[in-house]
Amino acid sequence: MKTKTRQPTGGTTAAIGSAPAPWPRVSASPTNAGSTERPEARPSRGTIYGRLFARFYDGAMKQLEREGGAELRHNLLAQASGRTLELGAGTGLNLEHYPEAVTELTLTEPDPHMVKRLRCRLEESGRDATIIQAPAEQLPFDAGAIDTVVSTWTLCTVDDPDAVLAEVARVLDTGGRFLFLEHVRSEDSERTARRQDRVTPLVRRAICGCRPNRRTLATIEASPLELEHVRWGEQPKGSLPWEKPMIVGIARKPSI
């Protein structure tokens, strides 16, 4: 079993029921290609708070996983293949769901406390993978190096979703797929949407940057990716009331 951890060096729509320093971009080699300031602040990843959040994350997700979250992961990740990159891998809850069609797996995660727990889960899993401590806005890969990118409950937390999706499009090979599972701002209930707007400032501080009112589907549609399929639904029991609206889908990097 091979476990590697590396830190950077420098459509269709169907409706159904901190690191304080900037992160450098590197290539897979790696070689330093500059750095970019992160646009928004969030609770420090090096604090006691960050350590506690990582410690209790799996417990907080337990009911959601049992009530259908694990099945959602499994069904989505069954479509992953080839060189696969996961954004915001957290503690590694997706690991057991990757199919044999995945020939090379890389897990990115910016939080050092999450990385520690991710490494332990990877070692226990017995699968071959590489862990890279890096944010989704600055992926350490050459253009066209990836066949599948995965994001499960990650785009709500990133500082700049437009930059993330631009990076996803950059690293994907032509025809490569972006598999996503995200909670989003409600489009069916104005009452729910207003509640999400009200709680977002507090939730963002309390849950490591999570924005319940993010219009993630619109962001994907405006990205360089081509939406192939998306379905709407509600998250399973165990999710918070303002996190119920959910999208699951696939986008593809089109031919130029």
Specify the residue positions occupied by each region the protein language model found.
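A short SAM/SAH-binding and catalytic strip from SAM-dependent methyltransferases
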Residues: 147-160
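Class I SAM-dependent methyltransferase SAM/SAH-binding core
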Residues: 85-138
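C-terminal lobe and adjacent flexible extensions of AdoMet/dcAdoMet transferase-like proteins
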Residues: 246-256
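Local beta-strand N-terminus motif with an aromatic residue
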Residues: 81, 146-147, 225
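A short acidic, Gly/Pro-enriched loop at the edge of an enzyme's catalytic core
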Residues: 137-149
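Conserved class I S-adenosyl-L-methionine
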Residues: 23-26, 31-82, 93-97, 114-117, ...
